[in-house]
């Protein structure tokens, strides 16, 4: 009954607690790893276990919201699978928030495996598969059938992966011992024994196959919660959304925040590197737990802030392209906006270009932000369509933008300073007069915009209201303008200024599985843009036939009021291929502004 004593006294010796939790595992292996010689690391490129030498071919993950990108991304939260994928050539993340191992819903382990099968993405040499379930099988109230359905679903799923080659040759499978769910703020302490039962089962699955390794998050997170300062945290008990990006463990009552996700990623990386030799040879149980605790005592997993993650390096972002899962990134492409003058000329034209950015710090809340520069280009033209047309125009705008994006809790603040260079070309033709003219004009704009977003995350939906304020200073350069029917006119340089405010809300629904590995992603947006100030435009001009006469004209510029509705849908195929369609309309001028756009994103 020693185990029961430890269950009631969870604040006792950690090593003793972890050994008590896993003591039943040590002798249950049908093919014990500790009877075999040390296994070389199949992911090593040079025979060592150094992090720089590890290269996985494809990382596949199955699980729940702890792994699902649709949960972490809207919250600007680190995702452990993305972090670990820095060691791989690619990531296939099939996890879905709320999923169970038990085959009881459309998002369970079996469904995720079906989604994988429909992609025709076969397991090949040096692939790593990670299975991470259990929290939702316990739930808030505990299991009602002693995990009978969960065990069956988990076993069937693992067997399907084994049959697919997940443990053949140089391939490996990681199964994950969950953190102590009962120490999560929103869960009762009474569920501790069920966590122990579940982890014992998962460990037995690992011990049944020499190429399946149990990754012990239970032991690590108990150490984190008992002494958070060792892991760069000040609190591992309470919820604080803002500080979960910096020094608190929990984002909400059920989930760790970015720092917790970073710890999970670090544990997986440890098993792939420094911990490989013992993890691949020892059964999940007392010996493996002792070895993991020894690594923790030797500070091999503590210095998280000293290890740069993928989010801290330089990043090249292609704009107006989709992510691999078919969704556009709100943290990337939405922040780069053409100024309103250019928008009025381009209507529904979208900027294309690239951005290069980096995190301004290696730790703390600033490490979640991005500083960078974006280069974008817009173009639109109208052509002569029949004999009644007299003019065609072409408009180009090239922009260089310095930007800063900073998440804080569910807020995302972005600011950008842009220099836009515009070029206008107008061609005129009159066949009857046998006369044609070409006029080239240029202008530039300095634009400063600030935007604040806040994301409300619900089951299956992310709702993001936002507000913006911008100022633009425009300069229209002087030039000679030719006309088909009057004398040429020399225009002088002209300057003006605009101030705009914007309000809007964006909706993004969680991916919907539509069969054969495809996902349907649906989004919508409603925004209102209004000019707070538009200065009048004063034009100075001189006709060529009257060179000594300077004339001027002041043009009052009407206020801008636009309320735009946009709808978009993307079908994400496997291997990053996606197809999308969008519809946009200005509700104040619907008959004049309807626009439909169809896109395809095919990586090569």
Please annotate each region the language model reported.
Residues 2, 27-53, 280, 285-286:
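Bacterial Sec-dependent N-terminal signal peptides
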Residues 185-192, 227-241, 344, 385-393, ...:
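Solvent-exposed, glycine/polar-rich loop segments of beta-barrel outer-membrane systems
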Residues 132, 160-196, 215-219, 225:
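Active-site segments of SGNH/GDSL-like serine hydrolases
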Residues 1-33:
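Gram-negative bacterial Sec-dependent N-terminal signal peptides
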Residues 185-192, 205, 212-258:
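Mobile gating loops/cap/lid regions near enzyme active sites that modulate substrate access
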Residues 120, 296-463, 557, 581-601:
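Outer membrane beta-barrel translocator domains of Type V secretion systems
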Residues 69-152, 286-289, 293:
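Conserved SGNH/GDSL esterase-like catalytic core that processes O-acyl groups on lipids
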């Amino acid at each position: 009954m020693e185990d029961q004593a430890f269950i009631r006294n969870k604040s006792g010796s950690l090593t003793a607690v972890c050994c008590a939790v896993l003591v039943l595992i040590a002798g249950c292996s049908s093919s014990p790893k500790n009877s075999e010689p040390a296994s070389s690391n199949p992911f090593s490129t040079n025979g060592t276990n150094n992090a720089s030498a590890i290269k996985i071919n494809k990382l596949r993950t199955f699980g729940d919201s702890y792994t699902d990108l649709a949960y972490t991304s809207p919250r600007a939260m680190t995702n452990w699978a993305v972090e670990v994928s820095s060691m791989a050539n690619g990531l296939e993340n099939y996890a879905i928030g709320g999923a169970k191992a038990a085959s009881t819903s459309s998002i369970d382990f079996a469904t995720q495996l079906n989604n994988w099968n429909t992609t025709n993405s076969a397991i090949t040499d040096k692939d790593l598969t990670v299975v991470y379930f259990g929290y939702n099988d316990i739930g808030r109230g505990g299991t009602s059938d002693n995990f009978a359905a969960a065990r069956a679903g988990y076993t069937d799923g693992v067997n399907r992966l084994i049959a697919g080659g997940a443990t053949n040759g140089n391939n490996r499978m990681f199964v994950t011992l969950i953190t102590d769910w009962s120490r999560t703020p929103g869960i009762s302490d009474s569920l501790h024994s069920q966590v122990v039962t579940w982890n014992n089962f998962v460990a037995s699955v690992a011990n049944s196959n020499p190429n399946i390794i149990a990754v012990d998050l239970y032991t690590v997170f108990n150490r984190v919660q008992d002494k958070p300062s060792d892991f760069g945290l000040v609190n591992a008990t309470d919820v604080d959304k803002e500080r979960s990006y910096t020094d608190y463990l929990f984002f909400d009552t059920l989930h760790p925040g970015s720092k917790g996700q970073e710890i999970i990623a670090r544990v997986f990386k440890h098993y792939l590197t420094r911990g490989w030799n013992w993890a691949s040879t020892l059964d999940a149980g007392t010996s493996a737990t002792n070895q993991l605790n020894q690594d923790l005592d030797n500070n091999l997993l503590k210095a998280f802030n000293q290890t740069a993650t993928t989010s801290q390096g330089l990043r090249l972002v292609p704009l107006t392209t989709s992510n691999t899962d078919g969704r556009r990134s709100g943290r990337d492409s939405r922040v780069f906006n053409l100024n309103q003058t250019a928008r009025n000329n381009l209507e529904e034209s979208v900027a294309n270009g690239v951005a290069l950015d980096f995190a301004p710090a290696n730790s703390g809340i600033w490490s979640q932000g991005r500083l960078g520069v974006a280069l974008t280009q817009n173009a639109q033209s109208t052509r002569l369509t029949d004999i009644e047309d007299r003019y065609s125009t072409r408009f180009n705008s090239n922009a260089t933008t310095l930007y800063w994006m900073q998440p804080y809790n569910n807020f995302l603040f972005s600011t950008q300073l842009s220099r836009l260079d515009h070029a206008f070309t107008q061609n005129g033709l009159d066949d009857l007069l046998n006369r044609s003219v070409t006029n080239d004009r240029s202008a530039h704009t300095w634009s400063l915009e600030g935007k604040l977003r806040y994301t409300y995350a619900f089951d299956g939906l992310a709702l993001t209201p936002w507000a913006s304020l911008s100022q633009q200073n425009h300069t229209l350069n002087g030039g000679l303008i030719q006309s088909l029917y009057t004398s040429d006119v020399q225009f002088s340089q002209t300057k003006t200024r605009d101030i705009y405010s914007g309000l809007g809300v964006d909706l993004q629904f969680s991916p919907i599985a539509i069969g054969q590995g495809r996902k349907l992603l649906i989004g919508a947006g409603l925004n209102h843009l209004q000019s707070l100030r538009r200065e009048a435009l004063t034009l100075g001009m001189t006709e060529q036939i009257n060179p000594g006469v300077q004339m001027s004209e002041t043009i009052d510029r009407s206020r801008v009021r636009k309320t735009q509705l946009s709808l978009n849908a993307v079908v994400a195929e496997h291997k990053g291929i996606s197809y999308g369609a969008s519809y946009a309309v200005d509700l104040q001028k619907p008959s004049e502004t309807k626009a439909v756009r169809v896109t395809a994103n095919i990586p090569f």
